């Protein structure tokens, strides 16, 4: 990928100099991909990207609207950006992302500093939007969230240069009672395989080693576009891309884990023995209230099947504590389910009431109950995670180097196959004296111990270094005021 401007837009300069644009990106990895895509579009049409708010002529806030805390964080970021417009160099404020389809008009009414609203299906027009507002227009570019958008254009990575998220679809056809994503992102739309593989090749050419495959519902991939599940075939195609070393799967709906998909995990070395399965609860009664199409017994059988077919598979899941209708007995069933499944990594979230959802209209549990149940579930999982980590002691694992560790000279930090970036812990390891390891190197590490959610180890001798990921010109081009994880 080149970062040279292709066709400069009329609004890309002010007084003979390039317009500088700063980004505030909030929410999940899927939102981050949208931000990276907007940055790529603007850079290739003559704009400069800055990560300093005081330098920005234009600020773009890519919002998250998934839960109340994320919405409040987004509003706070918009208000802080508005201060730069009223007191600083900033001339224009753009609000994009998940809050726009649902709350855009309200935001524009309450925060007059907002010059433009950009819907979740309208990112390809970000250059026109910025040019328009710099020409004195107020712009509302909000298409139907179901509009088909293919992100088959250049991105500028906001992740370290060796790792990239690869979004294979947009939207979701599930109707979970607690979830507002279909209201913000529309129905599921799969990207064509050719488009995804082309992007993977470009990312590999930039030095990316690890692809993290994401969407709102990854295992639904292909059912709309090809009328059959196509995730397994897509993974085989991605595994043929030179330069890619690891392929990691996230957001896998459990009822669509096929034997073909499991076979790809077993037989394709690049597809990691790692699977993210958002299961949400362990009580059948609560699962019915949530409108989830499976039951706890089926989930447990799936976990057992995966561990039988892929003995060292690392499983991650997410759960909701305090959902409307959840009794103390239901919650105890959730704890029992966690103990039975023994997931390697778990995120437990206190239920958040969302406007426009079925669960949002039900009688709500007190906030203190929801928070207390979340904390109890995480206490149970913490001990499980420690036991699962202990199983890695004595093994020699391939580790992707991320940098030096603050533990001291000769110590480095990286991740193994069972650790997704930013959420699953790391490997802290010691290398032989004088070892020159760089981010993106792959090394063999013998695991010697466990520290909380992290693994400890020593690089084996002779040290095996498998090349170096290319450094990016702009590793972190996104201006972060705050970041919701």
UniProtKB/Swiss-Prot annotation:
Q: Which residues bind [4Fe-4S] cluster 2?
A: 172, 176, 179
- Chief localisation class: cytoplasm
Q: What class of enzyme is it?
A: transferase
Which reaction does this chain catalyze?
L-aspartate(89)-[ribosomal protein uS12]-hydrogen + (sulfur carrier)-SH + AH2 + 2 S-adenosyl-L-methionine = 3-methylsulfanyl-L-aspartate(89)-[ribosomal protein uS12]-hydrogen + (sulfur carrier)-H + 5'-deoxyadenosine + L-methionine + A + S-adenosyl-L-homocysteine + 2 H(+)
Which GO BP terms apply?
Answer: tRNA modification
What's any one GO cellular component for it? cytosol
Cofactor: binding details: Binds 2 [4Fe-4S] clusters. One cluster is coordinated with 3 cysteines and an exchangeable S-adenosyl-L-methionine.
Alphabetical list of Gene3D superfamilies matching this protein:
Methylthiotransferase, N-terminal domain, Nucleic acid-binding proteins, tm_1862 like domain
Q: Which UniProt keywords apply?
A: 4Fe-4S, Cytoplasm, Iron, Iron-sulfur, Metal-binding, S-adenosyl-L-methionine, Transferase
Which residues are in the TRAM domain? 390-461
Which locations, inside or outside the cell, does it occupy? Cytoplasm
Q: What is its EC number?
A: 2.8.4.4
Residues covered by the Radical SAM core domain: 158-387
Q: Which InterPro entries match?
A: Elp3/MiaA/NifB-like_rSAM, Methylthiotransferase, Methylthiotransferase_CS, Methylthiotransferase_N, Methylthiotransferase_N_sf, NA-bd_OB-fold, Ribosomal_uS12_MeSTrfase_RimO, rSAM
Q: Name its co-factor(s).
A: [4Fe-4S] cluster
- Task of the protein: Catalyzes the methylthiolation of an aspartic acid residue of ribosomal protein uS12.
Q: Which family does it belong to?
A: Belongs to the methylthiotransferase family. RimO subfamily.
Q: Which HAMAP family match?
A: MTTase_RimO (MF_01865)
Q: What is this protein called?
A: Ribosomal protein uS12 methylthiotransferase RimO
Annotated source species: Symbiobacterium thermophilum (strain DSM 24528 / JCM 14929 / IAM 14863 / T)
């Amino acid at each position: 990928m080149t970062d040279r401007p292709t066709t400069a837009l009329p609004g890309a300069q002010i007084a003979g100099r390039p317009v500088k644009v700063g980004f505030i990106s909030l929410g999940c990895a899927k939102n981050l991909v949208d931000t990276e895509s907007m940055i790529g579009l603007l850079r290739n049409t003559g704009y400069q990207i800055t990560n300093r708010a005081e330098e920005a002529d234009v600020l773009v806030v890519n919002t998250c609207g998934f839960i109340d805390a994320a919405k409040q964080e987004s509003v706070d970021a918009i208000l802080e950006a508005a201060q730069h417009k009223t007191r600083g160099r900033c001339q224009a404020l753009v609000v994009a992302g998940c809050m726009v389809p649902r709350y855009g008009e309200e935001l524009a009414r309450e925060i007059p500093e907002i010059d433009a609203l950009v819907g979740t299906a309208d990112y390809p027009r970000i250059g026109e939007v910025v040019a328009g507002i710099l020409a004195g227009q107020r712009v509302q570019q909000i298409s139907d969230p179901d509009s088909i958008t293919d992100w088959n254009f250049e991105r500028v990575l906001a992740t370290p240069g060796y790792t990239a998220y690869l979004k294979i679809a947009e939207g979701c056809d599930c109707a979970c009672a607690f979830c507002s994503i279909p209201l913000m992102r529309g129905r599921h739309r799969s990207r064509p395989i050719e488009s995804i593989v082309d992007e993977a090749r470009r990312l590999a050419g930039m030095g990316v080693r690890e692809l993290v495959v994401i969407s709102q519902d990854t295992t639904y991939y292909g059912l709309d576009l090809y009328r059959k599940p196509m995730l397994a075939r897509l993974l085989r195609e991605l595994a043929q891309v030179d330069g890619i070393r690891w392929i990691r799967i996230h957001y896998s709906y459990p009822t669509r884990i096929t034997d073909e998909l499991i076979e790809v995990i077993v037989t394709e070395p690049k597809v990691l023995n790692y699977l993210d399965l958002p299961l949400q609860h362990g009580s059948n009664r609560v699962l019915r209230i949530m409108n989830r199409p499976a039951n706890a017994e089926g989930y447990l059988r799936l976990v057992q099947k995966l561990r039988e077919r892929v003995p060292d598979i690392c499983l991650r899941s997410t759960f909701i504590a305090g959902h409307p209708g959840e009794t103390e007995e239901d919650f105890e069933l959730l704890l029992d389910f966690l103990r039975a499944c023994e997931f390697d990594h778990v995120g437990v979230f206190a239920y958040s009431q969302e406007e426009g959802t079925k669960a949002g209209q039900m009688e709500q549990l007190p906030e203190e109950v929801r928070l207390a149940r979340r904390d109890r579930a995480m206490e149970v999982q913490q001990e499980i995670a420690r036991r699962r980590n202990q199983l890695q002691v004595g093994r020699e694992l391939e580790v992707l180097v991320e940098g030096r560790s603050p533990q001291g000279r000769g110590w480095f930090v990286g991740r193994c196959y069972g650790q997704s970036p930013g959420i699953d812990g790391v490997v802290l390891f010691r290398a032989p004296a004088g070892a020159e390891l760089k981010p993106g190197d792959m090394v063999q590490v013998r695991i010697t111990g466990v520290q909380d959610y992290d693994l400890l180890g020593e690089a084996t001798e002779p040290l095996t270094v498998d090349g170096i990921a290319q450094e990016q010109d702009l590793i972190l081009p996104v201006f972060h005021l705050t970041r919701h994880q």
